[in-house]
């Protein structure tokens, strides 16, 4: 899809289709009023006859409107003018794109970016339109012998902005939106791959492909032999039952003017399949445990977006690839593991494995002398119970970092909600035989998991994103969502000090 911005009046547009908004009840937006005036009341007459009420998502396609140069005019219901919010705006854009494809239009000029959305500027509206469009066009059929027959003739979409001085803002919004969309698509593609293809080595190969096309990015891997030398016994224990070797992929992006500038480190849990190990999961929906590498998919997608944007910062992305399988060689409940940090962990349940991988990675990243560390993981079902599918769980021992991430989530529409990380919860991890257990019991499961990780992240500013509820959808729309790529990319854009709005 090709995107561009322009600033012009609707009567001068010669495109295949013009897209304008209509409010409820039957109220023309400013641009629609201009078209109505040009057409001598043609549009308002249709509305008076009840052809369109203006409810959110309603569509009415008009052909050969009098005195209008464009072949078609698409009227889009936008609801009540003062109630148009971010969620409705995204839904309207998605419905518009689907309708345009149904009409057979190859190009369109969209004036919906001129609508008033509460608390949002032109930059946000254009960027969100790009991301919503790309998201609506996504499909994963790489492994189907018969590809989908979906009709998608739309090739070019032009967003109109109110004034010429906003053209630069619009162009920047398209650039950022395309980068986020590219990263989100890679995240979804990698996460949707089946576990017989997407194993830890596959994650590494995907990272190398990005590095081949971006000179600022280098990729190295740490295999099991090197992990053993480093003392990453907790990480190794989790993968011991699998035929697929555990591989930690290290992606180093150097974009700062000063190459010695401290990097931001992103860590992604990469359990390419999680059977639960000896503490075997129930069979129902176990196929979805291929998504237990959603954190790593989010990091690799964010690293691609970062490379596309060429942000002037240094970032290290870690893909903690591993597979948790039952076998005679698998680790067991009751085992006590000595982590890379030297702390010991009593294993109460082998299905609480993500934290055992991440704890060693959080120790490993100390060598980068990081500015800060953010880990992202599909860590706990408890977070899904607490927050559902709308917000990722955010935990942090550093208030400024937590606020930055929350703000990035609000800006990008990929929201998070901060959870407590109080000392009282640490008591749930006490063990009579080791420094701690790997499970805090059923109460506050997402919090105690984050408390566990916090014990290995004391030498830098750290935050943890639990994306177990947001990384993928179940049911009829099963598949990766691409989150938290928008949040993490926005966080990096903000950190880089890149100009965004007006």
From Swiss-Prot:
Residues engaged in binding Mn(2+) 2: 269, 274, 292, 353
Active-site residues, record numbering mapped to chain: 281, 355
PROSITE patterns xref list: CYTOSOL_AP
Database matches in CDD domains: Peptidase_M17 (cd00433)
The protein's required cofactors: Mn(2+)
Catalytic activity: Release of an N-terminal amino acid, Xaa-|-Yaa-, in which Xaa is preferably Leu, but may be other amino acids including Pro although not Arg or Lys, and Yaa may be Pro. Amino acid amides and methyl esters are also readily hydrolyzed, but rates on arylamides are exceedingly low; Release of an N-terminal amino acid, preferentially leucine, but not glutamic or aspartic acids
Superkingdom field: Bacteria
Molecular-function GO terms, alphabetical: manganese ion binding; metalloaminopeptidase activity
Name under which the protein is recorded: Probable cytosol aminopeptidase
High-level lineage: Bacteria, Pseudomonadati, Pseudomonadota, Gammaproteobacteria, Alteromonadales
Encoding gene (name): pepA
């Amino acid at each position: 899809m090709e995107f561009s911005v322009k600033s012009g009046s609707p009567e001068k547009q010669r495109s295949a289709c013009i897209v304008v908004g209509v409010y409820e009840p039957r109220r023309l937006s400013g641009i629609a009023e201009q078209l109505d005036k040009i057409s001598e009341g043609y549009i308002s007459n249709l509305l008076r006859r009840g052809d369109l009420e203006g409810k959110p998502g309603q569509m009415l396609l008009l052909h050969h409107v009098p005195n209008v140069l464009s072949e078609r005019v698409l009227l889009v219901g936008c609801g009540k003018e003062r109630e148009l919010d971010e969620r409705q705006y995204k839904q309207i854009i998605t419905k518009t794109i689907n309708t345009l494809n149904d009409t057979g239009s190859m190009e369109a000029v969209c004036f919906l970016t001129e609508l008033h959305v509460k608390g949002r500027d032109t930059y946000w509206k254009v960027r969100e339109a790009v991301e919503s469009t790309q998201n609506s066009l996504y499909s994963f059929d790489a492994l189907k012998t018969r590809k989908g027959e979906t009709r998608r003739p739309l090739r070019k979409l032009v967003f109109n902005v109110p004034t010429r001085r906003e053209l630069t803002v619009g162009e920047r919004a398209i650039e950022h939106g395309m980068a986020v969309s590219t990263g989100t698509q890679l995240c979804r593609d990698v996460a949707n791959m089946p576990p017989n293809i997407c194993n830890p080595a596959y994650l590494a190969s995907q990272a190398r492909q990005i590095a081949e096309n971006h000179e600022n990015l280098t990729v190295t891997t740490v295999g099991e032999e090197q992990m053993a030398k480093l003392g990453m016994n907790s990480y190794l224990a989790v993968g011991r039952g699998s035929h697929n070797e555990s591989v930690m992929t290290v992606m180093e992006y150097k974009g700062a003017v000063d190459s010695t500038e401290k990097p931001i480190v992103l860590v992604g849990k990469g359990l390419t399949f999680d059977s639960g190990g000896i503490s075997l999961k129930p069979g129902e929906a176990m196929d979805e445990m291929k998504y237990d590498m959603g954190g790593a998919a989010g990091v690799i997608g964010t690293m691609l977006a970062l490379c596309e944007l060429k942000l002037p910062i240094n970032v290290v992305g870690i893909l903690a690839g591993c597979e948790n399988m039952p076998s005679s060689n698998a680790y067991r409940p009751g085992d006590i593991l000595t982590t890379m940090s030297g702390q010991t962990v009593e294993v109460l349940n082998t299905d609480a494995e993500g934290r055992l991988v991440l704890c060693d990675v959080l120790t490993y990243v100390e060598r980068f002398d990081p500015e800060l560390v953010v880990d992202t993981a599909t860590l706990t079902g408890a977070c899904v119970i607490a927050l559902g599918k709308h917000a990722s769980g955010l935990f942090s021992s550093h208030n400024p970092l937590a606020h930055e991430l929350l703000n990035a989530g609000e800006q990008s529409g990929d929201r998070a909600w901060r959870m407590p990380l109080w000392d009282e919860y640490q008591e749930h991890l006490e063990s009579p035989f080791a420094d701690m257990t790997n499970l805090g019991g059923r109460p506050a499961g997402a919090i105690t998991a984050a408390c566990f990780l916090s014990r290995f992240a004391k030498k830098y500013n750290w935050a943890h994103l639990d994306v177990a509820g947001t990384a993928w959808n179940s049911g009829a729309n099963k598949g990766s969502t691409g989150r938290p790529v928008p949040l993490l990319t926005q966080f990096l854009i903000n950190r880089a000090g890149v100009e965004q709005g007006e």
